[in-house]
Amino acid sequence: MSPIRLETEDHSRDANFNKVLHGKSGQEQSSFLAMLKKDPAAHKAALDEYYRHWDNKPAAKETEKDREERKAQYATLTRHYYDLATDLYENGWCQSFHFCRFGIREPFLQAIARHEMYLAHRMGLREGMKVLDVGCGVGGPAREIARFSGANITGLNNNDYQIGRANAAAQRVGLDKQLTFVKGDFMQMSFPANSFDAVYAIEATVHAPSLEGVYSQIFRVLKPGGTFGVYEWVMTENYDNDNQHHREVRLGIEQGDGISNMCKASVAIDAIKAAGFELLDHEDLAERDDPIPWYYPLAGELKYASSAWDWFTVLRMSHLGRFAVHNLIRGLETFRLAPAGTQKTADSLGVAADCLVAGGREKLFTPMFMMIARKPKA
């Protein structure tokens, strides 16, 4: 593994910025109302810092230097991305920021929960185990897996706002004694070696500048004999970086989802082995013969919606729904009810949605490359 320059952590700086930008909106149950309660100047600072990595850098002109600069700023890039996008995610999707497989007439939220529980089942999570959730978001998967398995889960996150929302949600549902959420960079974890019985990551380690780097940290904090399970975002082996269309799909996903550099599935396999793990199983779950594609909500395919709530969710993801949201947010910005730049972030998420659908349909990308691995006992 070539050396990766890690960003210096400054938790005090991040906490102060979070307090200015978000105020008490982390306690707000409504993500829509939370979106309106931001400090305009701090929001602009986050917006400018994030988009300086992407503006005027299309796929046709992207250089290796551009990618290396994003990797060097991986933690800041991801942290500010979620400062900008978290409320939009919660409002348009749910509190579990990931995709899933769907069965016929299976409700959206049920499918999301099943996807989480499937990973927990494959890992053998049990009552009383001490488990780490790497890149826990606002805690949706941790809450579901805690209920399902009875495990005690620690969520690791480098975004203070998401930690605040995760803590608030855990308290509302009475899981605050079973769940703990802590601040940290998953490339330089502060936990002692051999701390956890199991570790999982659900569509989160894609934000790492090096998969081998983050997997090595996971290996260090996992107890000997412990299991690591991951759903990884990767480009498939069909991806050709010399193909401009392929690069446009990748770059659209990266920009719209706060990713410094996405790699191929084969790189992920090599990385988990290089970190020291015994790879027990790996599979692209998107390649299973499912009757409904994983990307159907993003594609706005209403024919697959199984309930009124699902229909509304999918409608919001459709081009018509996104057009309506675009104009709603533009109106809110015009009347200074939402901070300037909210529309830009929402539009960027829309571009990412189109690229995710294209990547899925053309078999260039998968959000569910599952790997189950074990740390040797000796």
Question: Which residues make up each language-model segment?
Answer:
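A short glycine-rich, Lys/Arg-flanked "PGG" loop and its adjoining helix->strand segment in the class I
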Residues: 212-227
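Class I SAM-dependent methyltransferase "Motif I" SAM/SAH-binding loop
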Residues: 135-139
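Class I SAM-dependent methyltransferase SAM/SAH-binding core
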Residues: 130-132, 142-188
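A short SAM/SAH-binding and catalytic strip from SAM-dependent methyltransferases
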Residues: 197-210
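Class I SAM-dependent transferase core
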Residues: 62-70, 76-125
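A short acidic, Gly/Pro-enriched loop at the edge of an enzyme's catalytic core
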Residues: 187-199
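Substrate-binding/catalytic lobe of Class I Rossmann-like enzymes that use SAM or dcSAM, i.e.
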Residues: 241-368, 374-377
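N-terminal auxiliary segments of SAM/dcSAM-dependent transferases
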Residues: 3-88
